[in-house]
Amino acid sequence: MNGQKKKILLVEDDMALSAVYRSRLEIEGFDVREANNGEDALSATVEYRPDLILLDAMMPKISGFDVLDILRNTPETANVRIIMLTALSQPKDKERAESLGVDDYLVKSQVVIGDVVARVKHHLGIQ
């Protein structure tokens, strides 16, 4: 990557899974910050100003769907790229995320970490 590292906010309440994703993203050259619930995700987005957010859907305090809705309706965060990475595999869940403005929707059981990294790079315009 050229110049400054791209910033990723990883929002995941499963600490073990979060550690795996963080490690791989850092190996790939990203600056990664973690949030463990929706409330922390909102404050971290304002403070950290990430280039992309990997967002779980099912979390304590505020769901990923609500975080997505709030971010898309806040002028300062409306254009941040957001990939929802979730266990929810029903079409209605993906449709809900798309209606709220998600950039990509990945089901955890259907992807490996390399797929996630590839989608992150794609959305950040990295080869």
Region locations from a protein language model:
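Non-catalytic signal-transmission and effector/linker regions of two-component phosphorelay proteins
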Residues: 1-7, 114-127
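Conserved acidic carboxylate
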Residues: 12
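Two-component/phosphorelay signaling modules centered on CheY-like receiver
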Residues: 15-33
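Helix N-cap/capping motif at the beta->alpha junctions
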Residues: 34-43, 64
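Short amphipathic alpha-helix used as the core "switch/output" element in two-component signaling
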Residues: 43, 65-78
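Active-site residues of response regulator receiver
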Residues: 56, 86
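Receiver (REC) domain active-site loop signature in two-component systems and cognate sites
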Residues: 59
